[in-house]
Amino acid sequence: MSAVQPQEAFAVPAWSSPLAENPEVVLELRNLTKHYARRRGQSAPPAVQQVSLQVRRGEVLCLMGTSGSGKSTLLRHINRLIEPSSGEVLIDGSAISQLSAQELRTLRSRRIGMVFQHFGLLPHRSVRDNVALPLELRGEPEALRHAAADLQLHAMGLDGWGDHYPHELSGGMQQRVGLARALVSEPDILLMDEPFSALDPTIRRDLQSHFLQVVRERGITTLLVTHDPAEALRLADRIAVLRHGQLIQVGTPEELLKQPADAEVADFFQEHGARSATPMATIAPRKSATTPAPLSPGLSFAQALLLGPAALAASGRGGLYWLGFALELGAVAALGQGLATASFAWAALALIGLLSSRLLSVALARRPSRLRRSDWRLPWLVLLLSQALVLWRVLATDASGPWLQFPADRQVLLGTAAAIDQLIAWSQVTFESTFVGVIVAVRTVIESTESLLGWLPWPVPALALVLLAWRSAGAALALTSAAALLYIGLFGFWERTIATLALVGSSVLISLLIGVPAGILLAKRALARRLITPLLDVMQTLPTFVYLIPAVAFFSVGKTPAVIATVIFALAPMIRLTALGIQEVPKTAVEAALAHGATPWQILTKVELPLAAGSLLLGINQTLVMSLSMVVVAALIGAGGLGYDVMTALRNIKGGEGMLAGAAIVFCALIPDRIIQATLRQRDRTLHQS
């Protein structure tokens, strides 16, 4: 096989489309506009406004402008990483807005390559796999895509670096990898978003020369985003100058130097060549749309003195309102005590508290502030009502009635409880097959796990655990694991430990099967976050034994309801940490995969989940520890295991036996926790080492 055969294997016919009006024009932007959603109280000018531009085949066009001018936003419209609010992007005369999802992925993976300012490399993959990513996303065979990647690495001067990882390369080398990845599918359009700005000057100049040589040799149409005038003048055939989302001027470097469109364009390039003395026109710079919030005037002395803490609430200082609230209630209580006992000391204390609160209110509420103001009426009414009730409570020695004791109705409680019982009974009849299915599935998992662990000769799991501990964290944890196993075996806890591990392992497995998909949904859907997050908050605040009530109500007693209660108790951290891991995946890595034709499933499985593995491991660890914390509580409904030994010891008031069984539970939590923590530290060193 010749050196070029891998690349030839990926060659595709030209994208079928109507002929462009101008055969030299490969890319056209027509009246492109992009509006983003407005923030509350602020106007949002268009990020891109009515931009029309044509790019000829093989041309290097620089999108030039200061930060915030819309360069990168405009560039991302070309491969639909950003959808326009209006206008069209045409490639070879065909509007890409009409492409289906599959056609768009084909366009990205075969015709358009993209290079990013911050590289967008996947830290968990080798350099070779990073370069071959666009071909992998297309489903090309491994041998062909690796051969093509090696060919591009050779062209970039990176021979021998294919088996290394991105953190082992310098910034310039990483950007060469990014350029090789963009070119591996032989695109005819190359998008480059400030690819040289993060590099040292010497590395930058060398990589610029190499880039220019490659695109000239291959005839690649290139759009290069930059804010560096020298870079644009040196690399571009033409330069498009943008300002506040508007296209100000398009021309060759010579035209921009000799005939700038206005004074700002002239000033932009003045240090890099001669320019005309008189610019063609002057366009006033647009004022920033965002201005600081105006100062709100403070309250008058009389208002602040009269309202007291309510003045602080009205001026946006809610925390200080509660401090004044507490001071004044204390002052009122002291005043009531002074009136009841005719004590001067209590009256003086009341005066001090009241003065402290009012002086604090006057001093702070009169100041002008940018804090958001609110209405004073409700805080003031709550303060007055609370003061009146506290004063009444102090003065009324035989206080009773509904103001002191909340009115309760036992019949309401009994009626509500009966309604809940009826609902449970109805559910058990209506959804009997569902409950039976859940019971069978959970019991199968428990019994299979317990049977496997009980069937194995004890040295097999013991040796496996010690070896895993040694490989994960070294000799210290291996010795600790051996000591824990000796303790469990010597004191006769082995069978109980097997039962406990079956219970906990089943709970962790089910939590994984439910928690990971739920966490992914939580990370990707705002509606799911709004609906599920309050439920997770409730799940994480209830006491452990509360989870036994619905489990027993629907599934009776035994190991099955114990596992279900444990899953409900331990599920919330798995969901939250999965969502957190997905949300913390670098946007550049996701965008790079998307720009090269990844499907949503490929982004999830090849980018997000691998990079979120650390958070997933933390979720597993937290779920494991929380499941073990339920062992004793679950023994109340027949879960067995080490929790049964602890409960028996407590019931018979045998503290020694209870402590020994409890120590065995601690060992069951300690060893996996240390193994997972060591794995996380090793992973962090691998991904973040520089």
Where are these regions (language model features)?
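Transmembrane alpha-helices
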Residues: 564-568, 600-634, 656, 660-672, ...
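Conserved ABC ATPase signature
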Residues: 165-169, 173
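Conserved catalytic motifs of ABC-family nucleotide-binding domains
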Residues: 186
